[in-house]
Amino acid sequence: MVLSSKNDQPDHLFAAPIEKLGDWAFDEQVAAVFPNMITRSIPGYTNIITMIGMLSKRFVKPHTQIYDLGCSHGAACLSIYPNILDIPSCKIIAVEESPAMIKYCRENLMAHCDQIPIEIIEDDILNIKIDNASMVILNFTLQFLDPGHRENVLNRIYQGLNPGGILVLSEKFHFEDPDIGPLLFDMHHDFKRAHGYSDLEISQKSTMLKNVMRIDSVETHQNRLRQAGFEQMDLWFQCFNFGSLLALKTSSSND
């Protein structure tokens, strides 16, 4: 079950021309409309969140921890929670750097999750030690990190996952193919138009994200996961140029 904040508001942040567009930030304005914004901007987002809950039922083990790195409003945690109620001694650790976003996360998780220990940490995920993890979520988070830090994050996740543990890595993807890449780009814009965004809104948001969100190809992600130590991985969900990978730390893997 995916729950949403009682403070959800429609996203009209970029409906009027903005004279000076700065870089994107997850500030109070964005945080206030984030649930509406993300479901209208990322095709398949709701499906990914729902499936993360289903995956948790399969992979979370007793006496282990689940990490949601870059948890925003806590949607993935809320999806996981009802699926692991019967698994003893689990703990969810939700990490979010943005003070504005984590305010809504706290509100959501405190309102709906009272039967499993949940730790909410306001910090950069680069500072988080992963330990005794059966599941780690990176849901549209890695793309906002400096590319030079991404390998280090995945290395630490791999080291902190228990054998049999899973990483869910959801991202916007870059496609090199000169025909497929532009097609998927245009289809994504069509998706946003179909969800009520004007060309002005799409353009202004894209301009603000340009220097902040640096995306990789599926192959780059897979190579990085292999370098971290993951032996089994695959793309399990894709809609246009957005998707999600699963990476497993096999039972035979050694730290």
Swiss-Prot record:
Matches recorded under Pfam families: Methyltransf_25
Keyword vocabulary terms for this entry: S-adenosyl-L-methionine, Transferase
EC numbers for this chain: 2.1.3.-
Class of enzymatic activity (EC top level): transferase
Residues reported to bind S-adenosyl-L-methionine: 45, 70-72, 124-125, 139
Alphabetized CDD domains for the sequence: AdoMet_MTases
Record-level Gene Ontology MF annotations: carboxyl- or carbamoyltransferase activity; S-adenosyl-L-methionine binding
GO biological process: tRNA wobble uridine modification
InterPro entries: CmoA, Methyltransf_25, SAM-dependent_MTases_sf
Origin: domain of life: Bacteria
Signal peptide location: none
Database matches in NCBIfam families: carboxy-S-adenosyl-L-methionine synthase CmoA (TIGR00740), PRK15451.1 (NF011995)
Job of this protein: Catalyzes the conversion of S-adenosyl-L-methionine (SAM) to carboxy-S-adenosyl-L-methionine (Cx-SAM).
Subunit description: Homodimer.
Protein family per UniProt: Belongs to the class I-like SAM-binding methyltransferase superfamily. Cx-SAM synthase family.
Name recorded for this polypeptide: Carboxy-S-adenosyl-L-methionine synthase
Gene source species: Hamiltonella defensa subsp. Acyrthosiphon pisum (strain 5AT)
